[in-house]
Amino acid sequence: MSTLEHPLIDRFLDALWLEKGLADNTREAYRNDLQQFNAWLDGRGLRLEGIGRDAILDHLAWRLEQGYKARSTARFLSGLRGFYRYCLRDGLIAEDPTLQVDLPQLGKPLPKSLSEADVEALLAAPEVDDPLGLRDRTMLEVLYACGLRVSELVGLTLEQVNLRQGVVKVFGKGSKERLVPLGEEAIGWLERYLREARGDLLGGRPSDVLFPSLRGEQMTRQTFWHRIKHHAQVAAIGTSISPHTLRHAFATHLLNHGADLRVVQMLLGHSDLSTTQIYTHIARARLQDLHARHHPRG
């Protein structure tokens, strides 16, 4: 039996034809997808009926790097789900490995991003000679260096940042914790901000908030959004911008510089790889160095 062939694939497709009267073209597409997946698994010492969710996610990352479109991957996953439901129903496997794998979203527009030149212009917009401007510059640097959600950024406390190790501890959706590298540029701005500006903003008031407002309190997301829009106007950026735009730029630029999709998923705090797939219109190469070598400001 060649690595492409597998008796379970034929049995599944025959059952599908008998139960649903599947069109010949769809049936052959499913056959090709499943045979290709089986060959991919065989090359890694894995068996079609003995894999878990991680193997499927790894294969999805491989498909994306090979340039497969979202519609093609959606068809592949549809066939794969049907195959494993069939295996589960017949008692051939104990659990369905596709249950926690999301289908790619079709027709969803790409998130707005910025070019690296636009990001540089935005980062340079705040006047850093006063505490407010230095705070804003540092927030923008951290936002771009780490790809944080705005709620994660404004909620940062002093104890979440470790400048010696160069990482920030982030509590994302569902209180999931992740460590994200800061990079040299962001570390430098944080050191200057903590030395020159944060104390002036607090005015002697005790607080563990990393980026306090002028009242010494945690800044709201809406306030930071207005600050970003102001700096975007100063930088003459024509693209409509929001705090999330820099998160998109973080992901897009990392992938454009050769980052691995699974690493970007981890840095963004996405629970599923498919959420990160929308950025892969520019993904081309594997990551050689996790952050410092590939991030534009690493």
UniProtKB/Swiss-Prot annotation:
<feature type="active site">
    <location>
        <position position="270"/>
    </location>
</feature>
<dbReference type="InterPro" id="IPR011932">
    <property type="entry name" value="Recomb_XerD"/>
</dbReference>
<keyword id="KW-0963">Cytoplasm</keyword>
<feature type="active site">
    <location>
        <position position="244"/>
    </location>
</feature>
<dbReference type="GO" id="GO:0003677">
    <property type="term" value="F:DNA binding"/>
</dbReference>
<dbReference type="InterPro" id="IPR011010">
    <property type="entry name" value="DNA_brk_join_enz"/>
</dbReference>
<feature type="active site">
    <location>
        <position position="247"/>
    </location>
</feature>
<dbReference type="InterPro" id="IPR013762">
    <property type="entry name" value="Integrase-like_cat_sf"/>
</dbReference>
<dbReference type="GO" id="GO:0009037">
    <property type="term" value="F:tyrosine-based site-specific recombinase activity"/>
</dbReference>
<feature type="active site" description="O-(3'-phospho-DNA)-tyrosine intermediate">
    <location>
        <position position="279"/>
    </location>
</feature>
<dbReference type="GO" id="GO:0006313">
    <property type="term" value="P:DNA transposition"/>
</dbReference>
<dbReference type="GO" id="GO:0006310">
    <property type="term" value="P:DNA recombination"/>
</dbReference>
<keyword id="KW-0229">DNA integration</keyword>
<dbReference type="GO" id="GO:0005737">
    <property type="term" value="C:cytoplasm"/>
</dbReference>
<dbReference type="InterPro" id="IPR004107">
    <property type="entry name" value="Integrase_SAM-like_N"/>
</dbReference>
<dbReference type="InterPro" id="IPR010998">
    <property type="entry name" value="Integrase_recombinase_N"/>
</dbReference>
<keyword id="KW-0159">Chromosome partition</keyword>
<dbReference type="InterPro" id="IPR002104">
    <property type="entry name" value="Integrase_catalytic"/>
</dbReference>
<dbReference type="InterPro" id="IPR023009">
    <property type="entry name" value="Tyrosine_recombinase_XerC/XerD"/>
</dbReference>
<feature type="active site">
    <location>
        <position position="173"/>
    </location>
</feature>
<feature type="active site">
    <location>
        <position position="149"/>
    </location>
</feature>
<comment type="subunit">
    <text>Forms a cyclic heterotetrameric complex composed of two molecules of XerC and two molecules of XerD.</text>
</comment>
<keyword id="KW-0131">Cell cycle</keyword>
<dbReference type="Pfam" id="PF02899">
    <property type="entry name" value="Phage_int_SAM_1"/>
</dbReference>
<dbReference type="GO" id="GO:0048476">
    <property type="term" value="C:Holliday junction resolvase complex"/>
</dbReference>
<keyword id="KW-0233">DNA recombination</keyword>
<dbReference type="GO" id="GO:0071139">
    <property type="term" value="P:resolution of DNA recombination intermediates"/>
</dbReference>
<keyword id="KW-0132">Cell division</keyword>
<dbReference type="GO" id="GO:0007059">
    <property type="term" value="P:chromosome segregation"/>
</dbReference>
<comment type="similarity">
    <text>Belongs to the 'phage' integrase family. XerD subfamily.</text>
</comment>
<comment type="function">
    <text>Site-specific tyrosine recombinase, which acts by catalyzing the cutting and rejoining of the recombining DNA molecules. The XerC-XerD complex is essential to convert dimers of the bacterial chromosome into monomers to permit their segregation at cell division. It also contributes to the segregational stability of plasmids.</text>
</comment>
<keyword id="KW-0238">DNA-binding</keyword>
<feature type="domain" description="Tyr recombinase">
    <location>
        <begin position="109"/>
        <end position="292"/>
    </location>
</feature>
<dbReference type="Pfam" id="PF00589">
    <property type="entry name" value="Phage_integrase"/>
</dbReference>
<dbReference type="InterPro" id="IPR050090">
    <property type="entry name" value="Tyrosine_recombinase_XerCD"/>
</dbReference>
<dbReference type="InterPro" id="IPR044068">
    <property type="entry name" value="CB"/>
</dbReference>
<feature type="domain" description="Core-binding (CB)">
    <location>
        <begin position="3"/>
        <end position="88"/>
    </location>
</feature>
<protein>
    <recommendedName>
        <fullName>Tyrosine recombinase XerD</fullName>
    </recommendedName>
</protein>
<dbReference type="GO" id="GO:0051301">
    <property type="term" value="P:cell division"/>
</dbReference>
